[in-house]
């Protein structure tokens, strides 16, 4: 008489601990991979993905989302993490992304386009759903990668004729500063910026000053067009160069950042140069301290937080498949304070 076969026990569905054991990682690592976290080594991520495929493991749809390249993560590669305006924008960007359920991951490239490409490539390999870049100058290979992966990209602090962007016209903003000085009567106007190689914004701002002066029949003397490093010390050094460069010194300086302008003010005081009596100074960004300098700094105000919020809105819409506007203009504005005045000669003529 044949014995009855025991009832077959249904096969147990694999769980996260099974994936962890097969992949040789912890269950926490499995969770991070399936939730799209970027902070997982590529070799461990690959091991987890292979294990989930081998076991047929699905956890609340996370593996399916991963296979569809949904990571709930946005990357940002910026030139300088010490720049106050970038930090303001990133803070607003992160707040907007957080409301949409996304995490922001950040890298700094130090004004090196090859480093920017490497950092962005790492992010793309680890998994991001969107990317923010600064400026309009980048390696073409970066956009080839994002296009192949259908990753939306937005450029900030600039405008572009072809790419999605959130920002302002750097040339127009700098021209506004130059025109204000020209209206005051200045003709010997210097321009001081940080590095312009692989930094389109510095060159565009200097070009905006030069173009505004040319339209008014003036020009920047070659010795008055300086490229320095970034920071307060660089501003101090710039004024020393301008005052010892031969020929008549400038009566006004347009600086590419407020930090450079701050350095100019410090060095002017050290040299006994009255600002704005003998020298007018204009900065760029309207940093928190600009209104509290002595004298208070005339500057170009950049609405960095608005730029960050608008960038978040653009990326969230693109990642959700919603319609978007390619260009979002957030104009910069001239803020007149106490570091600018008519040149001494113009004041004397007026008194006569």
Language-model regions: role of each:
Residues 137-148:
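Active-site-adjacent beta->alpha loops and helix N-cap segments on the catalytic face
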Residues 57, 110-113, 134-139, 160, ...:
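Short beta->alpha connector loops
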Residues 29, 75, 132, 190-191, ...:
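Conserved beta-strand positions in the central sheet of alpha/beta enzyme cores
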Residues 1-10, 54, 95-100, 148-155, ...:
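Bacterial carbohydrate/catabolite-sensing allosteric modules
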Residues 57-122, 127-130, 195, 207-211:
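Amphipathic helical "hinge" segments at domain boundaries
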């Amino acid at each position: 008489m044949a014995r009855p076969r025991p009832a077959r026990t249904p096969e147990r569905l694999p769980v996260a601990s099974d994936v962890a054991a097969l992949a040789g990682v912890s269950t926490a690592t499995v969770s991070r991979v399936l939730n799209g976290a970027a902070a997982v080594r590529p070799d461990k991520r690959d091991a987890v993905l292979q294990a989930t495929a081998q076991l047929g493991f699905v956890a609340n749809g996370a593996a399916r989302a991963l296979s569809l390249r949904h990571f709930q993560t946005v990357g940002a590669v910026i030139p300088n993490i010490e720049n106050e305006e970038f930090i303001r924008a990133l803070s607003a960007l992160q707040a907007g992304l957080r409301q949409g359920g996304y995490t922001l991951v950040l890298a700094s490239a130090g004004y090196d386009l090859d480093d920017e490409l490497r950092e962005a490539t790492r992010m793309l390999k680890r998994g991001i759903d969107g990317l923010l870049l600064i400026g309009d100058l980048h390696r073409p290979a970066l956009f080839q990668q994002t296009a192949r992966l259908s990753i939306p990209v937005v450029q900030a602090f600039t405008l572009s004729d072809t790419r999605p962007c959130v920002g302002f016209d750097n040339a127009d903003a700098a021209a506004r500063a130059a025109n204000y000085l020209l209206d005051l009567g200045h003709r010997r106007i210097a321009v001081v910026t940080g590095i312009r190689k692989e930094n389109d914004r510095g060159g565009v701002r200097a070009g905006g000053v030069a173009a505004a002066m040319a339209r008014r029949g003036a020009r920047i003397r070659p010795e008055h067009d300086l490229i320095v490093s970034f920071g307060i010390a660089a501003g101090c050094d710039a004024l020393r160069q301008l005052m010892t460069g031969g020929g008549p010194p400038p009566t006004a300086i347009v600086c590419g950042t407020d930090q450079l302008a701050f350095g100019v003010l410090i060095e002017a005081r050290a040299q006994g140069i009255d600002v704005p009596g003998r020298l007018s100074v204009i900065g760029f960004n309207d940093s928190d301290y600009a209104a509290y300098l002595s004298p208070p700094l005339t500057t170009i105000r950049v609405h960095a937080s608005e730029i960050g919020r608008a960038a978040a809105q653009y990326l969230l819409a693109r990642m959700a498949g919603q319609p978007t506007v390619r260009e979002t203009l957030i104009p910069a504005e001239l803020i007149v304070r106490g570091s600018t005045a008519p040149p001494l000669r113009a004041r004397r003529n007026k008194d006569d």
